[in-house]
From Swiss-Prot:
Gene that encodes it: Svs4
Organism: Mus musculus (Mouse)
This protein's GO CC annotations: extracellular region
Record's signal peptide: 1-21
Induction of its expression: By testosterone.
Pfam annotation, one family: Svs_4_5_6
Name this polypeptide is given: Seminal vesicle secretory protein 4
Taxonomic path: Eukaryota, Metazoa, Chordata, Craniata, Vertebrata
Membrane spanning residue stretches: none
Cell location: Secreted, Extracellular space
Tissue distribution: Testis.
Ranges of compositional bias, category Low complexity: 38-50, 83-98
InterPro entries: Svs4/5/6
UniProt superkingdom: Eukaryota
């Protein structure tokens, strides 16, 4: 009797697990299809009717503006890196470890002697 109930219980568990797995697989396929549809949609939220890719053309005068903006941002980043690289105690603010600070100070003391 005990082995029969164990067999029936394992059979029931197998059926329940299979049913749960099947439902999970169906939900996964549905969500995968939804993701595919959302990626195939156009940037405006509707399906693109033409098979040609959209090409964005930039006006000529905006190219020069962008170049000057890029140059000003690079000079400001240079200034920022100079500020970051030195602080009041001589260590950098980028996260120099205390171990490397001690190594540097020991090396400089050894070089002076």
């Amino acid at each position: 009797m005990n082995s029969t109930s164990l067999f029936l219980f394992s059979l029931l568990l197998l059926l329940v697990t299979g049913a749960i797995g099947k439902k999970t697989k169906e939900k996964f396929l549905q969500s995968e299809e939804t993701v595919r549809e959302s990626f195939s949609m156009g940037s405006r939220g509707h399906m693109s009717r033409s098979s040609e890719p959209e090409v964005f053309v930039r006006p000529q005068d905006s190219i020069g503006d962008e170049a000057s903006e890029e140059m000003s941002s690079s000079s400001s980043s240079r200034r920022r890196s100079k500020i970051i690289s030195s602080s009041s105690d001589g260590s950098n603010m980028e996260g120099e470890s205390s171990y490397s600070k001690r190594k540097k100070s020991r090396f400089s003391q050894d070089a002076l002697e």
